[in-house]
């Protein structure tokens, strides 16, 4: 994904959650000129202190951050590779040697609420080993659909690595409740859509049930 993140907003929500959104722009492959991605990050330990920074300005004790909307396109870069000021939140914990902190994150192209719903439906627990086992089982099922005979070990490694990359890049854009973003309205310029307008759409319920897998 050759895109630049701008206009990021993040805030603390309660003792153990950070949520917000950011806009992505500058896609080499085309599509909408700006796409917003919402996110939720949950922690299994209370955050004692949060600092923020944006565009080189550090603000201790501030639980929210709003990043710049501006970005600068690099010379001879076409539609991609734009530079933008960085921004973020720094989370501090009261920990002792040997303590572990777990976090999980979920995204949505529609809303923060949907990102939270996705997390609740797909990973409502804190069992790390169960998540790892589920991930291994799912990847083995997908990669095991093709058996390769002959060739060297390096050639097989390259084949399965390329297959993994192919599967990894085919993400869903609809949420657990069937809502998805429609950015098809706007001015077409080649493979790009300029001034794309966001519309929230809804998949039929039967489609949602078909593609929903149970949590471990």
Report residues per predicted region.
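Beta-sandwich/jelly-roll carbohydrate-recognition scaffolds of carbohydrate-active enzymes
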Residues: 1-207
């Amino acid at each position: 994904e050759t895109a630049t993140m701008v206009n990021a907003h993040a805030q603390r929500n309660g003792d153990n959650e950070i949520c917000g959104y950011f806009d992505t722009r500058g896609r080499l492959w085309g599509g909408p000129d700006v796409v917003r991605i919402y996110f939720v990050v949950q922690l299994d330990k209370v955050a004692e202190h949060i600092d923020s920074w944006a565009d080189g300005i550090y603000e201790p004790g501030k639980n929210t951050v709003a990043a710049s909307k501006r970005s600068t396109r690099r010379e001879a870069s076409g539609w991609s590779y734009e530079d933008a000021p960085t921004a973020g939140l720094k989370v501090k914990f009261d920990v002792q040697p040997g303590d572990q902190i777990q976090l999980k994150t979920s995204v949505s192209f529609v809303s923060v609420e949907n990102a939270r719903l996705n997390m609740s439906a797909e990973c409502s627990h804190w069992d790390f080993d169960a998540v790892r086992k589920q991930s291994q089982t799912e990847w083995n099922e997908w990669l095991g659909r093709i058996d390769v005979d002959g060739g060297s070990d390096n050639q097989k490694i390259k084949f399965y690595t390329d297959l993994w990359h192919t599967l990894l890049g085919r993400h869903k854009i609809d949420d657990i409740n069937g809502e998805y973003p429609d950015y098809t309205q706007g001015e077409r310029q080649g493979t790009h859509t300029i001034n794309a307008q966001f519309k929230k759409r809804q998949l039929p319920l039967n489609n949602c049930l078909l593609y929903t897998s149970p949590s471990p």
